[in-house]
């Protein structure tokens, strides 16, 4: 261990062990998954915190050998055992890219699209993107790079093949092979009533396909083929959101499908249900009418939805009348 710390020091990294770990130092061969909490601090006397994974409620997961954008994290993680807590003071040469990495991690923590920022955009938008990271502290750090302290608490180290790999860590070939399996897992979870977990699986499968689609020319046969795989997954995701009563997300996604495929019966039906739930009666009726036009066999189901909508509207009208009577009776 002394030799390891000496080599780190030669490379501009000073390690200080706060709590010893347990067992032997893992081999950390390529594909090993390290799960840890991290805290990033300024190296000045105040040592103010820049980022803290505990505050976000989810630890960091790093796959060794996947060329993470902040190589120093892979370097320091390789020196740690499970249960160990340590601080690493890293020279500027190791921390220059931290602001960009931190922005991505913050986006993920806020539940934003993991592909956000990777899509094509106009030159002006790209110029703005490069000039600002959207966080004042990260902008300041990018303009004035400095040594940083990484406080790492190693929770778990898993060897290759002993864990389910996250989509973002997969190669293109691995993504393509994983999508059907993730889709099946989502279906199983939905059947068992685990709707939130099913939605997460569908989301992962969509993210895999979107990532592959970004590498194709829009409108090309390969791009269209991937889009046709995305659509049923997105409809399943919308079904989960209907159950979770997140209706506006359903409206958004179903509309995006119908902008491309205006004969998709399931998208009209789910959007109609979402419109009905948020009292957009005319829009709901129009979508249900389109369902009947495209598939008359669904008449019994559509009739049931329309009756339910009419009953809710009558009930709401009666409640509104009672409320107004109460107001004017005072």
Curated annotation (Swiss-Prot):
UniProt xrefs under InterPro entries: AIP/AIPL1/TTC9, PPIase_AIP, PPIase_dom_sf, PPIase_FKBP_dom, TPR-like_helical_dom_sf, TPR_rpt
Major location category of this protein: cytoplasm
Domain of life: Eukaryota
Transmembrane segments: none
Keyword Membrane: no
Pfam families: PPIase_AIP
Modified residues (Phosphoserine): 43
CC per GO annotation: aryl hydrocarbon receptor complex; cytosol; membrane; plasma membrane
GO terms of biological process kind: protein kinase A signaling; protein maturation; protein targeting to mitochondrion; xenobiotic metabolic process
PROSITE patterns per the UniProt record, alphabetical: FKBP_PPIASE, TPR, TPR_REGION
Entry's Gene Ontology molecular function annotations: aryl hydrocarbon receptor binding; enzyme binding; GAF domain binding; peptidyl-prolyl cis-trans isomerase activity; transcription coregulator activity; unfolded protein binding
Record domain PPIase FKBP-type: where: 31-121
Localisation: Cytoplasm
Keyword annotations: Cytoplasm, Phosphoprotein, Repeat, TPR repeat
TPR repeat copies, ranges: 179-212, 231-264, 265-298
Subunit structure, interactors included: Interacts with RET in the pituitary gland; this interaction prevents the formation of the AIP-survivin complex.
Function: May play a positive role in AHR-mediated (aromatic hydrocarbon receptor) signaling, possibly by influencing its receptivity for ligand and/or its nuclear targeting.
UniProt name for this protein: AH receptor-interacting protein
Source organism of this protein record: Rattus norvegicus (Rat)
Underlying gene: Aip
């Amino acid at each position: 261990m002394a030799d390891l710390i000496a080599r780190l020091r030669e490379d501009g990294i000073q390690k200080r062990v706060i709590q010893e770990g347990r067992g032997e130092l893992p081999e950390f061969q390529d594909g090993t998954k390290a799960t840890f909490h991290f805290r990033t601090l300024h190296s000045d006397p105040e040592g103010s915190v820049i980022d803290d994974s505990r505050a976000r409620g989810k630890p960091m997961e790093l796959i060794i050998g996947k060329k993470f954008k902040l190589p120093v994290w892979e370097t320091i993680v390789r020196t740690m055992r499970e249960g160990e807590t340590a601080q690493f003071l890293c020279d500027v040469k190791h921390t220059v890219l931290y602001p960009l990495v931190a922005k991505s991690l913050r986006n993920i923590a806020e539940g934003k699209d993991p592909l956000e920022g990777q899509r094509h955009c106009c030159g002006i938008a790209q110029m703005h993107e490069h000039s600002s990271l959207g966080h004042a502290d990260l902008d300041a750090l990018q303009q004035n790079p400095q040594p940083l302290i990484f406080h790492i608490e190693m929770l778990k180290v898993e060897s290759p093949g002993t864990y389910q790999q996250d989509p973002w860590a997969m190669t293109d070939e691995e993504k393509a092979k994983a999508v059907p399996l993730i889709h099946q897992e989502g279906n199983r979870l939905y059947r068992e009533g685990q709707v939130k977990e099913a939605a997460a699986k569908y989301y992962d499968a969509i993210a895999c396909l979107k990532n592959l689609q970004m590498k194709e020319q829009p409108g090309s046969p390969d791009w269209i083929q991937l889009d046709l795989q995305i659509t049923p997954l997105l409809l399943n995701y919308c079904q989960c959101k209907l159950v979770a009563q997140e209706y506006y997300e359903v409206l958004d996604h179903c509309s995006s499908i119908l902008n491309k495929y205006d004969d998709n019966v399931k998208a009209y039906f789910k959007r109609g249900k979402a419109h009905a739930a948020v009292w957009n009666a005319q829009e709901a009726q129009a979508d249900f009418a389109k369902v009947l036009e495209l598939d008359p066999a669904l008449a019994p189901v559509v009739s049931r939805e329309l009756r339910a909508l009419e009953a809710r509207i009558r009930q709401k009208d009666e409640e509104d009348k009672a409320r107004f009577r109460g107001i004017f009776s005072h």
